[in-house]
Amino acid sequence: MMSRANSRFSCQRTWLLSVVVLAALWSFGVHRAAARVINDECPNLIGNRDLYKKVEWICEDCSNIFRKTGMASLCRRNCFFNEDFVWCVHATERSEELRDLEEWVGILGAGRD
């Protein structure tokens, strides 16, 4: 039979374990969200995340349309400055936005080696 002190201690351990597990899961989610907007190939990403998200959306749409493994990575390669990105713009039927997208890619990739 458990005493009242043992019962209280057991309850505290359960709560502590729950808090630790939730904190770990939250931390994992934050790291994944932060990693999503990090692209080492785009030197001007900081301060231009809104542009990055607009351009990246093309790659996400393209990947969802064709369901080809690695399609989004190919599209993002060299900070979107590649023929796969242009192909995805046309495949997602956004050809009329190509000039704006190319300008945004130029801003994101300015200073690239």
Curated annotation (Swiss-Prot):
Keyword Signal: yes
Claim: Transferase is one of the keywords in the record: no
Disulfide cysteine pairs (residue numbers): C42-C79, C59-C75, C62-C88
One of the protein's GO biological processes: circadian rhythm
Tree of life domain: Eukaryota
Pfam families, per database record: Crust_neurohorm (PF01147)
Family: Belongs to the arthropod CHH/MIH/GIH/VIH hormone family.
Function: Inhibits Y-organs where molting hormone (ecdysteroid) is secreted. A molting cycle is initiated when MIH secretion diminishes or stops.
Name the record gives this protein: Molt-inhibiting hormone
